[in-house]
Amino acid sequence: MKFRPLGERVLVERVEEDTKTSSGIIIPDNAKEKPLMGIVKAVSAKIKDDKILKENDKVVFGKYKGAEIKLDSKEFIVLELDDILGVIEK
């Protein structure tokens, strides 16, 4: 299923964190905080035209921002451009 964000929005897939600590303790899903980083999967036409973000950019966003949605049994978050704090560059 394709999703096309409108306005100044982007579709982001969260980057999963390790489920095991350095000492070998496995962290259960209900004890983990959701990561505040993700990979951009789709951008609105306005953002694409302005060349601010592009697909596959790794971004950092605020803790209580965006709307969570499910597409093809995968979880994503739809964020306003202003909710994105920055891009992680390689």
Curated annotation (Swiss-Prot):
Pfam families, per database record: Cpn10
Keyword Cytoplasm in annotation: yes
One function term, GO molecular function aspect: ATP binding
Subcellular localization, as worded in the UniProt entry: Cytoplasm
Keyword Chaperone: yes
Gene3D superfamilies documented for this protein: GroES chaperonin
Subunit composition and interactions: Heptamer of 7 subunits arranged in a ring. Interacts with the chaperonin GroEL.
The name this protein goes by in its record: Co-chaperonin GroES
Originating species: Helicobacter hepaticus (strain ATCC 51449 / 3B1)
Gene name for this UniProt entry: groES
